């Protein structure tokens, strides 16, 4: 490392800015029903007013409000019923003054009608109806365009489409939508000690947990993933990196980023001509992280320690990859909130420290009952069930139950 470690804020800003400058992914058109979780490639706008006509929000009678003047249970107004309208009907004629139209929820108001009286305030007559209440103009009417006006932007480009978006788009007659092609990420686990989970265990070896965990997290967010592993050999690492970069939009490695004799990733990036964005972050865990651009693609080199890799994946790699995938920046970032600790952490924090945790209902719980060993960067099992990181600022002492802390909730 030739430069001083940058702050977490600086590191995040650097990778987000770089991601925003990368070439946009080509769009693809897919069926609306398959679009949940995908990213809108362009603004999706309303093609029509919704609702497309003035309609009734209840079962009752469509009326001219002037005809209801003085109506009450003591002095009902009686009107002839000249038409009946259900949802899906199109009124053929206007409603004459001095007449009523029987109308059901969702049915269009006939021309001339300017209010609807609920049936509970009538005698529910079929030929004639007695009105027991007076109405004002426009009372009990759902107006054309009240929900969505024609031309309004339903989902700006970069929006992650939710079931609610799909419902509104379906109401506009969208059968297909243009979305960003999924970004493909190459996952490369480096280490001569690594085995695929399908291989028989051998002395001195460990199974590749990082690769599986990181790939699963990225797939959970909608990325396409290609996963590989290789030995601690700079030539092999270089070849694997080049191979993945020809097929993938970004590459994430784990292992080989510190200052050990077999930590070759800094040399590999230099050999390949990468432009470094981040050369170490002032935090624990994950300080040796590297981030770079190479051939117009993002490369993140994470620690081989499982929690260090998981933390920096959440803090830096995922936000940048989501931005490169076309998301709006605000939806790429871990949501920040303040929660109350239910248990403590006994160590002081000279530098910025991040602890895995579970947040729910304004409270946040550290795994291992606050036991410092549970938060070792090499501990993997304590990550199970966690949905956030607790941020402990540099210079903090031990944190105690009941203290309020900053929490970074994992991006969804």
Describe each region flagged by the PLM.
Residues 1-9, 177-302, 306-312:
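Helix-rich terminal scaffold detector
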Residues 2-3, 62-228, 373-374, 389, ...:
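Short, glycine/charged-enriched hinge/interface segments at domain edges or termini
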Residues 4, 8-12, 28, 32, ...:
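Generic structural signal for well-ordered, non-membrane alpha-helical segments
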């Amino acid at each position: 490392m030739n430069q001083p470690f940058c702050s977490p804020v600086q590191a995040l800003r650097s990778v987000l800015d770089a991601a925003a400058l990368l070439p946009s992914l080509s769009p693809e058109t897919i069926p609306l029903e398959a679009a949940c979780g995908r990213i809108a490639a362009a603004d999706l706008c309303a093609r029509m007013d919704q609702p497309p006509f003035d309609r009734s929000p209840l079962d009752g009678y469509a009326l001219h409000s002037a005809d209801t003047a003085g109506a009450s249970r003591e002095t009902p107004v009686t009107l002839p019923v000249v038409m009946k309208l259900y949802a899906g009907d199109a009124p053929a004629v206007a409603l004459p003054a001095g007449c009523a139209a029987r109308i059901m929820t969702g049915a269009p108001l006939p021309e001339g009608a300017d209010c609807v009286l609920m049936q509970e305030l009538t005698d529910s007559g079929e030929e004639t109806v007695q009105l027991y209440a007076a109405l004002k103009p426009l009372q009990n009417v759902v107006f054309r365009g009240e929900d969505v006006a024609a031309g309004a932007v339903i989902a700006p480009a970069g929006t992650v489409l939710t079931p609610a978006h799909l419902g509104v788009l379906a109401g506009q007659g969208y059968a297909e939508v243009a979305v960003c092609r999924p970004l493909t990420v190459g996952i490369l686990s480096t280490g001569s000690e690594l085995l695929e989970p399908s291989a028989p265990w051998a002395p001195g070896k460990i199974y590749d947990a990082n690769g599986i965990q990181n790939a699963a997290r990225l797939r959970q967010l909608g990325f396409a993933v290609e996963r590989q592993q290789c030995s601690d050999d700079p030539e092999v690492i270089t070849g694997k990196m080049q191979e993945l970069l020809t097929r993938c939009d970004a590459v994430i490695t784990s292992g080989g980023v510190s200052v050990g004799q077999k930590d070759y990733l800094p040399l590999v990036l230099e050999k390949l001509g990468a432009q470094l964005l981040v050369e170490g972050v002032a935090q624990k865990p994950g300080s040796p992280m590297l981030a770079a651009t190479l051939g117009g693609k993002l490369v993140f080199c994470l620690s081989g320690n499982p929690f260090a890799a998981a933390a920096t994946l959440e803090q830096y790699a995922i936000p940048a990859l989501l931005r490169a995938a076309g998301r709006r920046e605000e939806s790429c970032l871990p949501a920040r909130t303040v929660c109350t600790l239910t248990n403590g952490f006994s160590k002081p924090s000279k530098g910025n420290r991040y602890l895995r945790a579970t947040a729910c209902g304004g409270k946040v719980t550290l795994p291992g009952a606050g036991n410092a060993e549970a938060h070792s960067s090499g501990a993997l099992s304590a990550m199970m069930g966690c949905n956030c990181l607790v941020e402990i600022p540099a210079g903090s002492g031990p944190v105690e139950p009941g203290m309020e802390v900053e929490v970074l909730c994992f991006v969804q």
